[in-house]
């Protein structure tokens, strides 16, 4: 078993300093945030996918410290009821897939997302019970949105060689435990 860490815990450090620090602690693998809530402190796919020199510098820095990248992490809410926010999170997640493809990884880590309770919602609505009946109706609506989104996203990921999508089970999102 190898020890790994999400690099965003030291997002205030440049990537090289972060990797040097992790190496000194015996860390062997890193999960690198590249959008959404983790931010892009150590990996900005929009830059690295289009600037070969910066991409090579990124790769060389990881290699210099003999680190393995376990996954690119892009936790957001691509089904947020605010369409602008949803589009931004979706773009980050798709860029994470493209970054994984370029780097030769087959996995990204993310959240499932959580829609609102109806088409006119402005904020996510995290429902954790199916009764009284109103909640069951909300869950039906939400899971339709969730499944439709993920069918499309999984197809995109597969087209780009990403065959593992790890959903972090987290409160506030539709997938928050093993039963969901």
Predicted feature locations:
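Extreme N-terminal starter segment of soluble prokaryotic enzymes
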Residues: 1-4
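Short polar catalytic/cofactor-binding loops
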Residues: 7-14
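Catalytic domains of carbohydrate-active enzymes, especially glycoside hydrolases
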Residues: 16-38, 104-107
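Glycine-/proline-rich flexible loop or hinge segments
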Residues: 39-45, 73-81
């Amino acid at each position: 078993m190898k020890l790994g860490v999400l690099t965003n815990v030291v997002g205030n450090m440049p990537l090289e300093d972060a990797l040097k620090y992790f190496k000194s602690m015996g860390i062997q693998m890193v999960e690198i945030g590249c959008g959404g809530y983790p931010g892009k402190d150590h990996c900005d796919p929009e830059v690295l996918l289009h600037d070969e020199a910066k991409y090579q510098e990124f790769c060389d820095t990881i290699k210099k410290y003999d680190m393995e990248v376990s996954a690119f992490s892009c936790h957001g809410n691509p089904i947020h009821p605010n369409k602008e926010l949803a589009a931004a999170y979706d773009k980050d997640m798709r860029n994470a897939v493209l970054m994984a493809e370029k780097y030769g990884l087959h996995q990204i880590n993310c959240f499932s997302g959580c829609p609102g309770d109806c088409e006119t919602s402005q904020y996510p609505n995290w429902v954790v019970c199916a009764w009284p009946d109103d909640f069951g109706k909300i869950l039906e609506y939400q899971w339709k949105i969730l499944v439709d989104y993920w069918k499309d996203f999984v197809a995109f990921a597969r087209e780009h060689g990403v065959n593992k999508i790890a959903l972090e089970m987290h409160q506030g999102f539709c997938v928050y435990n093993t039963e969901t």
